[in-house]
Amino acid sequence: IENQGKNTPLIFTAVTDPEAAGLTNCDFITGTNDMNPVADQVALIHDVNPNAKKMGVLYSSNEVNSQVQCDLAIEKAKTMGMSTSTQTITSVNDITNAVNALVSDGCDAIYLPTDNVIATAVATVTNITNDLGIIVICGEEGMIGDGGLVSYSINYKALGVMTGEMGVQVLNGTKAGDIEITGLPVAELSLVINKKAAAAANITV
């Protein structure tokens, strides 16, 4: 970015944490973030099962963004009167033991954040949880396609349109740094349900 030069506006898209990426407070940079709505996603647990008492969170200890999502998920769960349990992994080889630990700890639901390691092995999670009727809430739509139950997910097409509109503003003379870095409002998120997963887990959604 420094080599880009400050005379050329830079517009980014789908950056989860622009501040951590060093993209904020620059007068030639703006764009959109794709931070998933963790609180809204966790709230889905009681939409599916109002009697759920304990939420587990499974994530990779190597991914800082996953820790951020874990903290947000726990914070929301507490406001819902749920207790929580967490398990971290370093590779897909750890997932089975980690999920079994959450099950043994009495979790009614498991939250999977947007996590690169977890995303490659969602089926490993649901192969255990489906037989037990445990709710699996996911951080993004792709994980639903791989076996997760439900998510509020970023609509990346809509996010791209929003980013493009920022580009138009810049082309029309607005300084990039004067355009607020933002993401999609909740109203434009997609509620994604995996009915096949619901049937496999004998869950009504």
What are these regions (language model features)?
Residues Q4-V38, G139-V150:
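Flexible loop/hinge segments that line or gate small-molecule binding clefts
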Residues I11, M55-L58, C107-I118, V136-G139:
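Periplasmic-binding protein-like
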Residues P18-T24, T30-K53, N155-T174:
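Hydrophobic alpha-helical segments within soluble ligand-binding/sensing domains
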Residues G31-M80, E180-A197:
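An alpha-beta-alpha
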Residues T32-A39, Y59-Q69, T86-N97, N116, ...:
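Hinge/beta->alpha junction and helix N-cap segments in small-molecule ligand-binding domains
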Residues T96-G106:
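Short, well-structured alpha-helical segments in soluble
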Residues M143-K196:
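Flexible loop/turn connectors
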